[in-house]
From Swiss-Prot:
Cell compartment(s), UniProt: Cytoplasm
Assigned protein family: Belongs to the HisA/HisF family.
GO molecular function terms noted in the UniProt entry: imidazoleglycerol-phosphate synthase activity; lyase activity
Protein name (database record): Imidazole glycerol phosphate synthase subunit HisF
Job of this protein: IGPS catalyzes the conversion of PRFAR and glutamine to IGP, AICAR and glutamate. The HisF subunit catalyzes the cyclization activity that produces IGP and AICAR from PRFAR using the ammonia provided by the HisH subunit.
Species whose genome carries this gene: Pectobacterium atrosepticum (strain SCRI 1043 / ATCC BAA-672)
EC nos: 4.3.2.10
Residue numbers annotated as active site: 11, 130
Pfam family name, one: His_biosynth
Reaction catalysed by this enzyme: 5-[(5-phospho-1-deoxy-D-ribulos-1-ylimino)methylamino]-1-(5-phospho-beta-D-ribosyl)imidazole-4-carboxamide + L-glutamine = D-erythro-1-(imidazol-4-yl)glycerol 3-phosphate + 5-amino-1-(5-phospho-beta-D-ribosyl)imidazole-4-carboxamide + L-glutamate + H(+)
Pathway entry: Amino-acid biosynthesis; L-histidine biosynthesis; L-histidine from 5-phospho-alpha-D-ribose 1-diphosphate: step 5/9
Biological process terms in GO annotation: L-histidine biosynthetic process
Length: 258
């Protein structure tokens, strides 16, 4: 069995790490490189960096900090933000990123997933899905341009359909960003994760809602995800990654402990 992964998420805006609640009202957390170093030293399995306004601003992720991160950490990291071409992805990988993630650009051009997978291999291609639960209808819908709350829009895709579509097109991994849970720290949406797990045959990463060590355990044992991504509990030092991994190991989760 492959070890489960603990993945800190660093949302980047204007060269700094920020964090919001339900993708809104972002506050500055700190500088990119020191935070990346800290998480690597604490025992993170990999890092994810989202340049959250790149797509809504119509630009690609700022590459200047990608190479600086690559110089100071020795764990894999994934970069996302406005990547719309094979060439842009190649630049980010050449700067030292191990994976690239696409979200809004994939919704605008689904064939982009295939072009990237064909060029760089599915192991490098992550698709992020920003999913919102509509309580009135009980449905889960995919949102686009979520980095800018003035431009965020609900797409015509229902979440499960889009999960199946991106796999057909070559996604090597899926990060499910559950917007209702984002930043509120009351647990991952296990019901939604189980629905997605049933149709997801590639590694699935849960994102949005972690507030306690038990929430990570629930995601692994109840929803059988491959990795758990979190931000505010790590940024605010509510949970230490090393202590979290020791706890998970004690609970029988297969995980790498430093």
């Amino acid at each position: 069995m492959l070890a489960k992964r603990i993945i800190p998420c660093l949302d980047v805006r204007n060269g700094q790490v920020v964090k919001g609640v339900q993708f809104r009202n972002h506050e500055i957390i700190g500088d990119i490189v020191p935070l990346a170093q800290r998480y690597a030293q604490e025992g993170a399995d990999e890092l994810v960096f989202y340049d959250i306004t790149a797509s809504s601003d119509g630009r690609v992720v700022d590459k200047s900090w990608v190479s600086r991160v690559a110089e100071v950490i020795d764990i894999p990291f994934c970069v996302a933000g406005g990547i719309k071409s094979v060439e842009e992805a190649g630049q980010i990988l050449s700067f030292g990123a191990d994976k690239i993630s696409i979200n809004s650009p994939a919704l605008a051009d689904p064939e982009l997933i295939t072009r990237l997978a064909d060029r760089y291999g599915v192991q490098c291609i992550v698709v992020g899905i920003d999913t919102w639960h509509d309580a009135a209808t009980g449905r889960y819908h995919v949102n686009q341009y979520t980095g800018d709350e003035t431009r965020t829009k609900v797409t015509t895709w229902e979440t499960l359909d889009w999960v199946e579509e991106v796999q057909k097109r070559g996604a090597g991994e899926i990060v499910l960003n559950m917007m209702n849970q984002d930043g509120v720290r009351n647990g991952y949406d296990l019901h939604q994760l189980n629905l997605v797990r049933d149709v997801c045959n590639v590694p699935l990463i849960a994102s949005g809602g972690a507030g306690t060590m038990e929430h990570f355990l629930d995601a692994f044992q109840t929803a059988h995800v491959d990795g758990a991504l979190a931000a505010s509990v790590f940024h605010k030092q509510i949970i230490n990654i090393g202590e979290l991994k020791q706890y998970l190991k004690q609970q029988g989760v297969e995980i790498r402990v430093c």
